[in-house]
């Protein structure tokens, strides 16, 4: 299976979740929306991140596919699977001045998509290219990408903060960790806002990723 074929599978997953969300919002009951909305939205966020991991580090996606094609069981957790904590978010134990430390082993940092290291190498420069691209962006559309970011150097911090908050909020709607009535917290307006934030984040990640220099 080629990398292109894997992208098609992931794209079809996103397309399916988008259709389900659209049907929920437009014609579903409020109860179905509040129960299923967070699950569909988190699926879109996770799948988008998987695609972008493959864009930056194709080997990681190919590795997962190779392992799953040989042996895959729904009865046990796959140690090779892409995870939010390991592959997307990564660690944040270093100060800005200690990102590159000769005393640390290479494997201690990992290669998470939203790690501070990847932020400095890929995301921050790509975001700067985006907001400087006057041939593409108008002043009005540029405001959609400036958001709450004071400078391009802080873009990765914005991504980490927003993605962490969004993932946590969506997960609470998916897992049974609440001991109070979830409808009190996840009413229709809350779920609609989470869905909106999910699409905004996925769109932002996708747009900025096109400005990443992988040459």
Functional labels for PLM-detected ranges:
Residues 10-26, 30-60, 170, 195, ...:
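Short, hydrophobic, well-ordered secondary-structure elements
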Residues 156, 172-212:
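Charge-enriched, short contiguous segments at helix-coil
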Residues 1, 43-55, 63, 167, ...:
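Aromatic-enriched hydrophobic runs in primary sequence
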Residues 17-28, 142-152, 172-180:
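Short, charged/polar, low-complexity loop and linker segments
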């Amino acid at each position: 299976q080629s990398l292109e074929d894997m992208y098609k599978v992931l794209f079809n997953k996103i397309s399916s979740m988008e259709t389900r969300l659209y049907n929920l919002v437009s014609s579903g009951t409020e109860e179905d929306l509040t129960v299923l909305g967070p699950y569909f939205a988190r699926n879109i966020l996770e799948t988008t991140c998987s695609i972008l991991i493959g864009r930056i580090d194709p080997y990681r996606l190919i590795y997962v596919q190779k392992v799953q094609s040989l042996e895959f069981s729904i009865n046990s957790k796959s140690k090779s699977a892409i995870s939010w904590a390991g592959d997307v978010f990564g660690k944040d134990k270093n100060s800005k001045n200690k990102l590159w430390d000769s005393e640390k082993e290479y494997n201690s940092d990992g290669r998470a998509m939203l790690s501070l290291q990847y932020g400095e190498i890929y995301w921050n420069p790509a975001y700067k290219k985006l907001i400087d691209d006057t041939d593409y962006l108008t002043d009005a559309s540029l405001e959609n990408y400036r958001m709450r970011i004071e400078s391009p150097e802080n873009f990765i911090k914005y991504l980490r903060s927003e993605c962490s908050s969004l993932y946590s909020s969506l997960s609470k709607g998916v897992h049974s960790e609440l001991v109070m009535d979830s409808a009190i917290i996840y009413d229709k307006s809350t779920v609609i806002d989470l869905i909106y934030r999910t699409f905004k984040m996925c769109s932002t990640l996708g747009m900025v990723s096109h400005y990443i220099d992988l040459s």
